[in-house]
Amino acid sequence: MPKASPRPGWRHEAAQERSQRTEAALARALAELTKERPFENISVADVAKRAGVAVGTVYRRFRDKRAMLHLSDTAFVDDCRRAFDDELSDERMAGLRLEQLARAYIDLMIRKFREHRTAILQVQRNADQRDAAIYAGRAAEFNAHVHGRFRTLLRERRKEITHPDLETALNLAIFFASAAARDAMWRQSLKAYPIQIDDAAFVHELTRAFVAYLQS
């Protein structure tokens, strides 16, 4: 039997500056539209019109409508990575104690998770599952970069960490904080509990829990 043709990529790479500008316009258009209504109620024509391009241009660039959700995902990842690299830079983190470092990381995470909430929920609900490996790979690369940087900063404050198993503690602390932030910001799971708490208070309490675990 002949081998099946490989699945086409989600887009054709934008090699020329004009193509890159077109993709940026489409990304902005999709971001605006997904804030207005669910992705399933958005057509390719809607995105093209908002971006100021022809429908044919979209289909020449992207495999199909759902492939455009990669734009939302890459926008989230790229924005978060830039923010983490800036706000957790050596210059900004110099001299900070463990609690201050943890607060800076958790505050940034909460802000970015809330900022991109609508777009990420649209991706989670509508992404083509045949592209699951692409999304997973993108997330893994991002986590390796950001979590790797954060672990390094935490290790530099080893004297403040009293947990007997440093590496296990670092990884579980990051996991606990990240999972709680995602659940609270994206799923809004705190609504199931009899508590009223704003983002600033949530950052404060999550920071306390993070530091307390590392010092247990």
Regions found by a protein language model. Give the residues of each.
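Generic hydrophobic, amphipathic alpha-helix propensity
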Residues: 18-30, 47, 72-80, 84
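Hydrophobic/aromatic residues within well-ordered alpha-helical segments
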Residues: 22, 72, 76, 80, ...
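Helix-turn-helix
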Residues: 25, 33-67, 71
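Hydrophobic alpha-helical connector segments
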Residues: 67, 71, 85-114, 170-173, ...
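Helical hydrophobic small-molecule/effector-binding pocket
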Residues: 78-86, 99-124, 178-185
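Short secondary-structure transition hinges
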Residues: 99-101, 114-148, 196
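Hydrophobic/aromatic-rich alpha-helical bundle segments in the mid-to-C-terminal region
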Residues: 121, 132, 136, 140, ...
